[in-house]
Amino acid sequence: MVRIFLTGYMGAGKTTLGKAFARKLNVPFIDLDWYIEERFHKTVGELFTERGEAGFRELERNMLHEVAEFENVVISTGGGAPCFYDNMEFMNRTGKTVFLNVHPDVLFRRLRIAKQQRPILQGKEDDELMDFIIQALEKRAPFYTQAQYIFNADELEDRWQIESSVQRLQELLEL
């Protein structure tokens, strides 16, 4: 039985690598944010606005516990999920946890392109975006680094890099 949790900051490649890794292992892939949106028929942004951060984080925790009941699955968490309640401890207890570590410059490049799809980043100038990323990583590092495995996910720009990363991740997890 395998249950793998991919954690990391937004833009780290949790969904990109998670889908490819699940395909390689021939197991389902669950993106926790997508799962929440399907269950509640609202975007994460709408739920966050409607319930506030505390309400959203509680809902996220409950949904994390729900998806953790599935076996033989790759789960990507939201970027903040490991940082609240006992979520990181829970994931470490119920599966294999991987922190997708990405250099801030790489995150900046990825998120700069994807700003329109991420409401929290809209309207940020380049220098503000870089400061935002660095500050968030500093706050979240104590949680992310509790993962059982730390994996460099800087190179996910094309199919070959993704395939190579999947192979490296499979070797790291000894699967």
UniProtKB/Swiss-Prot annotation:
According to UniProt, the reaction catalysed is: shikimate + ATP = 3-phosphoshikimate + ADP + H(+)
According to its UniProt record, in which pathway does this protein act?
Metabolic intermediate biosynthesis; chorismate biosynthesis; chorismate from D-erythrose 4-phosphate and phosphoenolpyruvate: step 5/7
EC code(s) of this entry:
2.7.1.71
Q: Which GO terms describe its molecular function?
A: ATP binding; magnesium ion binding; shikimate kinase activity
Superkingdom of origin organism: Bacteria
**Keywords of this entry:** Amino-acid biosynthesis, Aromatic amino acid biosynthesis, ATP-binding, Cytoplasm, Kinase, Magnesium, Metal-binding, Nucleotide-binding, Transferase
Q: How the cofactor binds, per note?
A: Binds 1 Mg(2+) ion per subunit.
Query: Where along the chain is Mg(2+) bound?
Result: T15
Name where it's found: Cytoplasm
Q: Which cysteines are joined by disulfide bonds?
A: none
Q: Where does ATP bind?
A: G11, A12, G13, K14, T15, T16, R118
According to its UniProt entry, the function of this protein is described as: Catalyzes the specific phosphorylation of the 3-hydroxyl group of shikimic acid using ATP as a cosubstrate.
Assembly: Monomer.
Q: Which family does it belong to?
A: Belongs to the shikimate kinase family.
How is this protein named in the record?
Shikimate kinase
Which organism's genome codes for this protein? Bacteroides thetaiotaomicron (strain ATCC 29148 / DSM 2079 / JCM 5827 / CCUG 10774 / NCTC 10582 / VPI-5482 / E50)
What gene name is given for the protein in this entry?
aroK
